[in-house]
Regions:
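Conserved catalytic or regulatory cores that recognize and/or transform ribose-phosphate-containing ligands
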Residues: 1-159
Length: 159
């Protein structure tokens, strides 16, 4: 068991601008890291993987698509949690990342802020679907990082 809790940020990339690929990932990463530091920096370390930091369509650092695919799928298989943005529900790569996580019993949380129609398999392979970034990040901090489920219970009661 690792001393680092690793979160992979999946979501559409191919037909999106660099900003559309990256901005939500940066916000979620900042929010999770900030919550981790505020809650208790002595608990398990958190590493948030933003694949745009490694490969994107703006800076062609790769030679082949296979290189990108293997790099990303390796991160998925070695993560403790996969967060998926439903910004492009028809993305083949995102669908593959969800399936790989599911097959490896890695929890999948979906962020669907625009209430896009999702394939039934996305829904079935996810552990929870959120329509709000802040609720998602609070849930991750409480449920996965600190294992303090009291704020999750109070959030559910408010619904």
């Amino acid at each position: 068991m690792s001393d680092v809790f690793q979160i992979y940020l999946a979501g559409g990339m191919q037909d999106l601008s660099f900003e559309e690929q990256n901005n939500w990932r940066e916000r979620v990463c900042r929010s999770i890291i900030t919550r981790h530091r505020m809650l208790n920096p002595r608990i398990k370390e958190v590493n948030v993987i933003n694949p745009v930091d490694y490969y994107n369509f703006q800076d062609a650092l790769h030679d082949t698509e296979k290189e990108v695919m293997r790099f990303d799928t390796n991160f998925v298989r070695n993560s403790d949690l996969v967060v998926v943005n439903a910004n492009d529900p028809k993305s083949i790569g995102t669908s593959m990342e969800i399936a790989i996580a599911y097959e490896h019993h890695i929890p999948v949380l979906i962020l669907n802020t625009k209430n896009k129609s999702l394939h039934s398999w996305w829904i079935e392979m996810s552990d929870k679907i959120f329509d709000d970034e802040e609720k998602l990040c609070t849930y991750i901090a409480d449920f996965y990082i600190t294992m303090n489920h009291t704020s999750v219970r109070s959030w559910v009661q408010m619904q």
